[in-house]
């Protein structure tokens, strides 16, 4: 199972008849899956996971899921919520999802999921904070225009920040729910001039880079690239709210700190993030 699909495909598989089997490499087997597996079991979906709540596991289904209400701790990943939302309308009784854990990370991704569902006539109601109801119904077909991945624009924007240069990124959407859109807010705070028009986003940096103290809990995927820019700032930077990055394909916080320090930089882990003190590399 690919990393980016390992939390989405199993829920979809519950709507098929048969016994699909899911597995991955050693890193995938270590990634958090318990919240999703427990949720599927609460929905009376038969899962054989040897009681480990990780890959590998098998799902046995007749293709019909009754749905109902579940509570889930998705503090390790918003993907657990999105995966359930995407199929909830095909459950007989729909699905109500309530997050009951610590702070929910990466809310822009959940907002993106809801926005896309509404575009195909799926009714999603926000009942309360971190509490959603997806009504049962037909999912309308649609021809989609896929936006550019704004998070992946980060390295190119970072190159202009670090070299005090200028760059245009074509086709940057004016209205988007993508986490990568926060590059605009972040790099402006670090000293860049940014212009967005109908054709492109322009970033120009002619100043020293300012360090930044920022909660990245909603945009944790931006952390590695932002850390590279912070190395060249004129003051320390602190990133918080990203403890969940320790459960990704690798411990991203530990990997960043190790590699920054190996290059001669100065980075330290904190309880929920890291601190970077700029120094010559």
PLM regions with names:
Residues 1-281:
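Short, structured segments at the rim of ligand-binding sites
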């Amino acid at each position: 199972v690919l990393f980016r699909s390992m939390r989405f495909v199993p829920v979809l598989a519950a709507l098929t008849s048969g016994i699909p089997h899911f597995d991955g490499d050693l890193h995938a087997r270590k990634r958090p899956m318990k919240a999703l597996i427990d949720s599927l079991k609460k929905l009376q979906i038969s899962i054989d996971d040897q009681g480990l709540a990780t890959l590998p596991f098998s799902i046995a289904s007749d293709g019909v899921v009754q749905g109902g209400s579940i509570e889930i701790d998705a503090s390790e990943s918003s993907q657990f919520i999105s995966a359930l939302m995407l199929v909830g309308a095909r459950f007989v009784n729909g699905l109500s999802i309530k997050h009951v854990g610590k702070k929910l990370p990466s809310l822009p991704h959940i907002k993106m999921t809801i926005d896309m569902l509404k575009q195909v006539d799926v009714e999603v109601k926000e009942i309360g904070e971190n509490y959603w109801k997806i009504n049962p119904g037909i999912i309308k077909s649609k021809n989609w225009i896929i936006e550019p991945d704004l998070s992946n624009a980060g390295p190119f924007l970072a190159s202009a920040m670090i070299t005090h240069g200028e760059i245009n990124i074509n086709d940057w959407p004016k209205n988007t729910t993508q986490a990568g859109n926060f590059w605009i807010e972040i790099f402006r705070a670090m000293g860049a001039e940014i212009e967005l028009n109908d054709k492109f986003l322009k970033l120009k940096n002619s100043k020293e880079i300012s360090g930044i103290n920022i909660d990245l809990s909603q945009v944790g995927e931006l952390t590695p690239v932002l850390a590279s820019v912070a190395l060249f700032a004129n003051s320390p930077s602190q990133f918080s709210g990203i403890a969940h990055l320790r459960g990704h394909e690798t411990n991203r916080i530990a990997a960043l700190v190790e590699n920054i320090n190996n290059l001669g930089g100065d980075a330290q882990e904190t309880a929920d993030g890291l601190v970077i003190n700029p120094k010559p590399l």
